[in-house]
Amino acid sequence: MSQVTLLDEVSQWNQETCQQELKTVLPKLVAMHHDTDSWEEHTNILQIITSRFLPHLSLSDLETGCFSTALPKVVKVFASLLEEISKQIGGLSSQNTELQLFLRKILKTMVQTLECLSGCVRHVCSIEESVSFSNIRSLPSCILGVLKDTFQHCKDSEVMYSGRLSLVGDLLQGLFKEAYSLQKGLMELLDKINFEDTASEEEISDIVTVIHSLLDICLIISRLDIALHANTWKFIIKQSIKYQSLVEDRLHHTDISFALCEDLCRSVENCLELAQQIQQAGLQEAVHSPEYKLFQKATKMCRFFANTLVHYTKEFKVFLSKSCSRFHQLYLQINSKFLPSLCAPSVPPTLSEELRVAVLVPMDAMLTQMMSFQPFAESVLNPDHQSSAKLFLPQCLLLVNVMGKLSSQPEEALRLWSDGSQFPEETPRWSVFEAVFQSFRLCVLERLVPVCLPGVMLRGQAQGTVSLHQHVCVHMCACVAVLPAQHFPPLERSLLAAVLQADTQTALLATDVWCFLARYGTAELCYHHVVLIAHLLRACPAGGYQLFHLALVLRRLLFLMTPKHQVEFVERFPLSQEENLCVWRHTLLKCLCVEARVRVEEQVLDRATVVLEEWQNSGCRLGEIPRLNRILDCVLLVVGGSGTQNECVESLVKIISQLWSHMRSSQVQVHVTLQCTVKLLLSLSAVLIKSLEPHIILQAVSCLSGLSIHQCPDDLLLAALEFLASLGQIFIPPNIQGQVLPQISSLFNGFLTRPSWLILHHVLEAFGCFAEITNHEEVISQTLKTEEVKSKVLNFLSKTVSRQESEETRLERLKEWKCVIEKHCQQMESEKSQPAQTPLTEEPCAKRARQETKAEEEYERYLQTAEGALKALQAIERSEHSPSPPQWVRARLQLLQTLITQINTTTEEQS
């Protein structure tokens, strides 16, 4: 009997005949199916086998009698059908009817193949006996291979068929529908099968293959059908957990976790796009609109993926060490989509909150369960972690969230986060406190804007929004309050490191937390910290940012010391010792108890008197000015204290008067140390302005007028403005008004032309203070001569905004400021890290010219200094009121002459 005759005959048989001829005919059909090269015949035979003979096979014969022999050929033929479509698709058009019919025939054949496989699944599901995987082993692998190819073809169809999709669209739709039904049936079938704990190696390998194959399908169908995508993920997770003890060490956990992360990110982005469309269409309130229902459906998917990820990580955490960096990145990416992140899209608040609850609540639960997992902590606390600027704030908020959870963690997790890496062989990681300060420092733009965050509960009521600084500070202090004492050392090291870095606001945050630690701890701890900072201050180079930051901490902590410890501190760091002046110059007397304050005032005045006398007795040498400036800094401390006694005021006025008599504009302009002296004298004079004699005020104003304002450092200008503003408090005597008042007007005019907007703001403030209380109104009129100056002052006093800045423009400006601030901090820290003397290179020839130029610049600078000093000395001698110079002056000049001769001789020899 020929093949055609057999097929025609079998197609006429009823079910009873098929059952009777099963053992004879089925092997022949399988052989025919294997040997045929005709797609049509292949499909016809497969339909006959699955519809007429498969129902009569016993459960034990399904695999050997049908599936293992027939299904491998199905996979090959299905792949060849897809390959043929790819070859012929280029010629498809509405005019080429022959090719159109050919391709439609192939697609129909593919649909029929899927129908046959669905028939196999339905039959196995209908069997009442308990089905084992060995009974159907070839069926899942065949179906999953065909499904993967089918879904991939459907996914690529829009590009593959391009504008000709309408010619085959109905068949593609039917193909997808049949594949959808087939996968659903297969998952139902596999769900009925139960593996025993004694499952064979082969069976375990099979179920792992099924899970991985479904994962591959998940990656394909993510944008094709939401329901199928979700159901496939449910099945993957369910099967993974169902057979956890068998498959947990064989699953590709990294692939599964990465795929879940990508699907969650994609779903959140889809939700936000829908929310933006709703906002643009003005449908925020239309809760029954199709758009809003679509948004709710998308939000449901987000919640599903987030909860699925939480469930998966909970069950397989120990196998997810390689995925921790992706989980960390996911947390940052998701949080960057919501306020207060500056890159969060603009969406209606109600929709944003709905999505936030759906996603961030599960993400927080995931963070909680990952807290004790060391690879996750290492990823979050990695010192070398690099991320884009938009993730700086999410990283900071993540760390703040971690601190809030530490109190509920076991000791091992607490040590993991709070202590940092302890040994070289460990993966480097910061302590969470150090990481918070580092991430806060990076949030420059967020601090400039500033972003606002919800406040904590206070007396049963929620605070309003707070700044990032306050948010971080409150949560860090709350963490410190419950931190066991054995974890204080890494906290203290982190606080000190944050104080010693260049960003001032980060140092201020560390200072706030440090003060809380000092108040929360014992008095002895506070005293110990103050002594430590005092020693660090003594070791700091003058004028550095570290000195400024340490001084900030010292001032704050002195307030918190007990009176007994304050007195001990005064005794431990007496002002009679030169090295202690740098400690006291940065304190505030009002923070001290009465006994300590009186001691400091007495020591400062005694020391100042001694230093001034020694300076005058030595001939007012320029080299002694730095020593004089150090004690003047401390004198300013006394002046700034409240309730200064009359005796102190008299002593201070005497010191100030003597020093003003020695200041000459020509010298001040040249010497930086004298500029510092004048700055201090101006600040002192501003406070004691009502106690100064008129001729001293004249000397101060004249000295200030003689300076070239545009060449003075900013701190000197600010002190000058403070002094000028204080002049409004006094009445200038008539005999010197003609000399003083015009100079005041001229100085204000000069300051008002400063290009720096920051200095200009201080100038306007100072002029406003002066104008508000002065009796000399002619100074005001003389200052406001030009319309430009008058306009600046009036706009400032009336608080007129010159131009309104859009939010976009402001944000761009702040981004530019951010770059400037970061560059400035990096520059300061790089200067600090450079050695004092750069070692010579072995081959300096390439840079020889630059070294010579630098030497010439140094010669020029020092010669100018020497010339200025000699001219100033000459001016003193030529003065009419100057007495004859003492004998030691002539001797010193003779020594200088000898030194000049020696320098000339050396220069001639070298040339």
Swiss-Prot record:
GO cellular component: chromosome, centromeric region; cytoplasm; kinetochore; midbody; nucleus; spindle midzone
Subcellular location as annotated: Chromosome, Centromere, Kinetochore; Nucleus; Chromosome, Centromere; Midbody
Coarse class of the protein's main subcellular location: nucleus
Pfam family, one: DUF4487
Molecular function (Gene Ontology), one example: protein kinase binding
GO BP: interstrand cross-link repair; mitotic cell cycle
Bias-annotated ranges (Basic and acidic residues): 844-853
Chain intervals for the UniProt region annotation (Disordered): 830-853
Family matches, as InterPro entries: ARM-type_fold, DUF4487
Keywords recorded for this protein, A-Z: Centromere, Chromosome, Cytoplasm, Cytoskeleton, Kinetochore, Nucleus
Function: May play a role in chromosome segregation.
Name this protein carries in UniProt: FIGNL1-interacting regulator of recombination and mitosis
